[in-house]
Amino acid sequence: MSTNLEFARFPAPDGMNGWWESLPPATDARTVASESRFDWVVVGGGITGLCAARRLAELAPGASIALVEADRIGRTTAGRNSGFFVDLPHDISSESYSRSIEEDRADVRFQRHGIDYVRDIVRRFGIDCDWRDDGKFHASANKKGAAALAHFADGLTRIGEAFEWLDQAAIKAVTGTDFYTGALFTPGCSTVQPAALMRGLAATQPDNVTVFELSPVTLIEPRGDTRVLHFAGGTIVAKQVILCTNAYAATFGMHSNGLLPVYTFASLTRPMNADEVAKLGGTRSWAVIPADPMGTTVRRLITDRICVRNHFAFRPDVKVSAADLAKARHLHQRSFARRFPMLGGVELEYTWGGPLCLSANNGALFGKRADGLYEAIGCNGLGLSRGSSSGKLIAEYALGESNSLVQQLLKQPHPRPLPVRPLVDLAVSATIWAKEFSAGAEL
């Protein structure tokens, strides 16, 4: 089956991305402004697309490759997250924690594969993105959170992963706040400034990769044994196409009813002054994940800013409103004040949202579609680690390579179909509300 594929939704501003805004101005973007030909086109300049384009170039140095992004690389979704390369299975809320030892270990291998790939690139090219292999703290704020961490620890023990317990005094020595009652430290997580990383990955692509930004694809049209990609300013004719569009895949072609674009929101403070740094205490850089998945993620950055992330909203049109952003900012200010009462004069400078691509069964899309296009879509909340790994692996698969990780992705379930709108809107939004309410003090 080979039909036209139309694109209707593109990245929206969705607030002011503090990661992007706090960087020096970006260099001028190269846009699609004429007709050109490439062997491969990768659609989507997030972490998945950046890794897919690079891996294609590494394995096929004689091929011509275009990487096309609708906005600026680093300003949209991949540069809007909290900057965690998470290596472990993500859901710590359930008592059983994980499915099976074998499946969880496979997920760890998959996620670490992506982390290792990107870390090597950062080191080889000296990408300035505050990459840190300092691990993360899973912190609790009450007895319910402490119980969740105990279940998490049981799961880690079953799969043979290292961790360390911290009591209230120990986690306060790290964070400067006595808000947390205790924490569990896991060493395998890396953290970054995500917008800086995306810019750096784009700027260091191999010579046979051409990067186009501010160039949304409006239509992919089959023409003989090629594909014609249409843009406002021109066209690209390609032999093969890889889709790495994550949440935006929910708005086009073949799998849309199984994908859930769920926004999460973050705020970044202004830099603290010397007096404020002294009042806070703790260490210069740390990363805290809440014991409840719907709770508040907090990072202290080496720039003396603090990043706060919480609140979720199902937005199937892949954009948020001013009211969404205002609500998120209010929640962030409240969460910040509860954790850092000593920093009452520290303002939130930026607030923004970004879409996750979730599915009801943690399914994802990987491989060759019925229309002949390749795809790697659906990171289920672990965009940096899963996206980097699946991007690298889809390139290998498309070039005919196979390995245990490729086979693992080919066997994973597809996203489970959902009820029609507006039923799914009501169901997902109600579920989010209930889970946020249940998070309680963790928010």
Name what the model sees in each region.
Residues M1-W40, E58-L59, A63:
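Extreme N-terminal leader/targeting segments of oxidoreductases
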Residues S2-G15, E21-S22, D91-Y97, R119-G200:
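Flavin (FAD/FMN) cofactor-binding and adjacent substrate-gating region
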Residues A57-R80:
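Glycine-rich FAD pyrophosphate-binding loop
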Residues R80-F110:
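Glycine-rich active-site loop/strand segments that organize a redox cofactor
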Residues A147, D154-G155, F179-K239:
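Helical element adjacent to the flavin cofactor pocket in flavoenzyme catalytic cores
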